[in-house]
Curated annotation (Swiss-Prot):
Protein name per Swiss-Prot or TrEMBL: Glucosamine-6-phosphate deaminase
Organism: Yersinia pestis
GO biological process: carbohydrate metabolic process; glucosamine catabolic process; N-acetylglucosamine catabolic process; N-acetylneuraminate catabolic process
Subunit structure, interactors included: Homohexamer.
Family matches, as PROSITE patterns: GLC_GALNAC_ISOMERASE (PS01161)
Key words of the record: Allosteric enzyme, Carbohydrate metabolism, Hydrolase
Site (Part of the allosteric site): 151, 158, 160-161, 254
GO MF annotations in UniProt: glucosamine-6-phosphate deaminase activity; identical protein binding
Taxonomic classification: Bacteria, Pseudomonadati, Pseudomonadota, Gammaproteobacteria, Enterobacterales
Gene name for this UniProt entry: nagB
Entry's family note: Belongs to the glucosamine/galactosamine-6-phosphate isomerase family. NagB subfamily.
Length: 266
């Protein structure tokens, strides 16, 4: 596992965006051989999306031959709802870059047959072989996507019941009322994430410090689903200073020295 210790949220977003752009450009995608990118929603990746848009407008990257799969979507929320992840992605990213509409994949939380929708999504991911890079965030309780504590580490795309803690955390997008946050969501599974060639998790804020500590220094434990990334061959944690507060000093020092050349010019 790599840990990229940075100073603040802006640096986390910039580093993550540069890494994505470098991966896409090195891959040299074509229509027949697209780059497959997994994407999250929420507050954490906002800076990364801003930098990706800026780099696209500067001519540094094209998303014309990039296929995206989002991590999750609320169940029962109309896709036109201002807080649906469909709306979030189009407002904050897709509408500002040159990605073709047919290359965008989002879960349908209003499907008549939810189980069939989850199978369809999983099968479509597999039809491309694998996701080359999955960017994600982490919840205060260590969840990735909507794989809440005690999720199976072999799980696939499915419906999940959201914990009250997650609904309270997400209530800031619903006028502060947790009762307006849907109780269920569709999410890619832990196993789906582990199948990706590379997983990059963005961790910002002191509230995520315990989750980062569990992921880096703790044991693999389904109560901290983020810890599953210890099993991944290419996992990266990109974190700001407040999120490292629960890590041992020597752990942060080790990774800071190890990644010194990779965090220049931020």
């Amino acid at each position: 596992m790599r840990l990229i210790p940075l100073r603040n949220t802006a640096e986390v977003g910039k580093w993550a965006a540069r890494h994505i752009v470098n991966r896409i450009n090195a891959f040299k995608p074509t229509a027949e051989r697209p780059f497959i990118l997994g994407l999250p929603t929420g507050g954490t990746p906002m800076e990364a999306y801003k930098y990706l848009i800026a780099m696209h407008k500067a001519g540094e990257v094209s998303f014309k031959h990039v296929v995206t799969f989002n991590m999750d979507e609320y169940v029962g929320l109309p896709k036109e709802h201002p807080e649906s992840y469909y709306t979030f992605m189009h407002t904050n990213f897709f509408d500002h870059v040159d990605i073709p509409a047919e290359n965008i994949n989002l879960l349908n939380g209003n499907a008549a047959d939810i189980d069939a929708e989850c199978r369809r999504y999983e099968e479509k991911i597999k039809s491309y072989g694998k996701i080359h890079l999955f960017m994600g965030g982490v919840g205060v309780d260590g969840h990735i996507a909507f794989n809440e504590p005690a999720s199976s580490l072999a799980s696939r795309t499915r419906i999940k019941t959201l914990t009250q803690e997650t609904r309270i955390a997400n209530s800031r997008f619903f006028g502060g009322d947790a009762n307006l946050v849907p109780k269920y969501a569709l999410t890619v599974g832990v196993g789906t994430l582990l199948d990706a060639e590379e997983v990059m998790i963005l961790v910002t804020g002191h509230g995520k410090a315990q989750a980062l500590q569990a992921a880096v220094e703790g044991s693999i434990n389904h109560m901290w689903t983020i810890s599953c990334l210890q099993l991944h061959a290419k996992a990266i944690m990109v974190c700001d200073e407040p999120s490292t507060m629960e890590l041992k000093v020597k752990t942060v020092k080790y990774f800071r020295e190890l990644e010194a050349e990779n965090v220049k010019d931020l």
